[in-house]
Each structure stands twice: as C-alpha cells, then as structure tokens.
C-alpha cells in the first residue's frame, strides 16, 4: 500500500550564508529599506567576531532533516517530507509552501523553531504559510502554536543547568538568567503572552533543576524608536551584581534553539565583557542544536499534532 505523504514545514528566522549576503538579509529584515553603511558594517563586524558567519543555517537544516527522519521512524505508515521555510532568507516560507503544492502534498504540519508564542514570531510565520496555502489551494497546514512548556524541553535545560552547577563551587553565589529575544513593548499592551510564557518556562526549568536564584531577562533588542521589552541581560547582570554580589552568572537563552549570532555574540561576547568587568564567572550551557535529546523533544511535539490528523482520518473512515 502506498504511504500517504505528510508535509513537515519547519520554519525559522534564517541567516546569511556568507558575509556577501548580509546586506540583502539586513534589508529584508528592514522591510526593503537598506541599512546605513555604519549599521551594515556593525553587523558584519559582529559576524566576523564569531568566526565570519553564523552556524545557524547548517544547524537549522540538520534539525529539520533529523526531525523528519524521526517522524518517519515513528509513523511508518506515512511518509514525511521535509520543507524548510525561512523568514528572512531563502528558502522563504512561501517557497516551501509552493514546493509542497508542486509535490502534491495535501496535508502538512508546521512547527516554528522557537518555543514561545508571539504575534511577531510564531503567529507571523504560520500566517504567512497558511495565507499562501489558501491562495493556491493547498496544502492544508496544521500549525503548532507553542511548546514553551514541553516537558522534554524543560528537562533538556534543567539537565544543562545541573551540569553547569557541577563546575561552580559556591552555588549560593550563582544566578541563572533565562532570556529570549526582546520584542517591542507594544505587544504587552496588545495582550501578547510572550513575556508570561518566558517566565513560565523559567519557573518550570528552575523547579526541575532545583535552583532558587534565577530571573528572566531580554536580549538582542532592535535599534528602533519604539521601546523594547527589558531589562536587557547586560544591564540585568550589573544590577544583580550590585544587589546580591553574585560571583557566577549562568546565561540560558531559552528563547533560542541553536547557536547563532545572538548567542555567540550577544551572550558569549557582550555578556562576558560585563562579567569580566565585575570579576565574576561567565557560564552558558550548550544550546539544543541538533542533539538527539532535542530532536526527540521536537518529534514528541509534532507527534501530538500528527495524532490529531490520524484520529480525524479514523473517524472519517469509520463513517
């Protein structure tokens, strides 16, 4: 019997593949407005500081393909086909939807490689995909909206923190900062759950790791006139040091799932500059990347959505 094909649409932010692509990438982020030469060179300088280019593109592809393999192993009566759709670089989200249509995919599941729901992130990604799929007559996309409290995601970070604490002598003088990408403050007034979800993630991980000294912070805010959510992790580090005299700072950028510019530069460079100034120790646990434990986490999340499709098919077949 021929296996039914299911599209697995994996969406992420995207990153330039080379320094030559940085300007086009930055221009796309700015909705078609080219950045100033000063802003462009600043961004290029950041990429150079982490080795020339971000590893994100390679990691994202690996995550998507390993997740697809895992789904095919779990649901042997179906054939999952992987489609990668990116927000700011090719292949764009629309490219992936059009490819699914050409391949004859009738049903698809979408997952964004970001755990916390926001109108700026997960909602925007899924709306782009579903809008085009409806315009071109398919496929039907079943979106996954959030997974910030997925037990396997919580366990991953709890284990990483426990491992990090084995390297710290005075654990009472250590603090964990859970962070995510800052967004414009106006989302809070609009009722966006983004901030609450980060706090919930932090609370769950802290409980699982049995830590008391922790807080949430925000990083990588955009350079726009609008105020962005704070406190920024660098300012927060200084404030925590002044108030509690912590000697070790553990940065857990749980809003991200891979090593990329925001982690390798904003955390590993900028935050470390601050801890060095304070004569404090800097720690940043391993990111999930394409580790098997994280792929298993993603597969569990997608499986839940897949079971909805399977159950619906069973109901239809029995009627």
From Swiss-Prot:
UniProt keyword terms in alphabetical order: Cytoplasm, Heme biosynthesis, Iron, Lyase, Metal-binding, Porphyrin biosynthesis
Keyword Metal-binding: yes
UniProt keyword tRNA processing present: no
Any GO BP annotation: heme biosynthetic process
Pathway(s) per entry: Porphyrin-containing compound metabolism; protoheme biosynthesis
Residues where Fe-coproporphyrin III binds: 13, 30, 46-47, 54, 125
Catalysed reactions, semicolon-separated: Fe-coproporphyrin III + 2 H(+) = coproporphyrin III + Fe(2+)
Major location category of this protein: cytoplasm
Recorded GO CC terms: cytoplasm
Binding site residues for Fe(2+): 181, 262
SUPFAM superfamilies for the chain: Chelatase
EC number(s) given by UniProt: 4.99.1.9
Subcellular locations according to the entry: Cytoplasm
Pfam family, any one: Ferrochelatase
GO MF assignments: ferrochelatase activity; metal ion binding
Summary of the function given for this chain in its UniProt record: Involved in coproporphyrin-dependent heme b biosynthesis. Catalyzes the insertion of ferrous iron into coproporphyrin III to form Fe-coproporphyrin III.
Name used for this protein in its record: Coproporphyrin III ferrochelatase 2
Upper taxonomic lineage: Bacteria, Bacillati, Bacillota, Bacilli, Bacillales
